[in-house]
Design a protein with these regions (language model features):
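N-terminal intrinsically disordered, cationic/polar leader segments
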Residues: 1-134
Length: 134
């Protein structure tokens, strides 16, 4: 299992799993986009590169997901595949997907923001939890 949805009053969250830190970040991104759209309907037609940095792993997770959410909102993109490289607290990621097409993409939730509320990134246990404002 790559990720699962978490119940949270008034908001929504995901619990992501990964054997490596990079996989944890990739699966968190997939989990976030699964809240937005059915990932099975998204084709990897284009690719964007994302670079973020932070002071700690939790901040790195928020910055990574928030940057992807920014691209979703401003460029009307949805993503289905993610590759991440992390060195220290610098992340370089690639997200593959396509422009939103109302004929093939039924949008689910409007995720407004990535929050620090109950945020957890635990690479030793291979789990991360993220709550989103909707």
């Amino acid at each position: 299992m790559r990720f699962e949805e978490l119940d949270h009053t008034a908001d929504v969250g995901i619990r992501a799993y990964g054997a490596t830190l990079e996989e944890l970040f990739e699966n968190a991104a997939a989990g976030m986009f699964s809240l937005i759209v059915d990932l099975e309907t998204v084709k990897p037609r284009g690719e964007v590169e994302v670079r973020v940095t932070a002071d700690d792993l939790e901040g790195l997770m928020v910055n990574w997901l928030q940057e992807l959410l920014f691209l979703h909102e401003t460029q009307r993109l949805v993503f289905c595949e993610f590759d991440v490289a992390i060195k220290g607290l610098d992340l370089t990621g690639r997200a593959r997907g396509e422009a939103i097409d109302k004929r093939s993409h039924e949008l689910r939730l409007a995720v407004k923001a990535v929050t620090y509320h109950r945020l957890k990134v635990d690479p030793e246990k291979g789990v991360a939890e993220v709550i989103f404002d909707i």
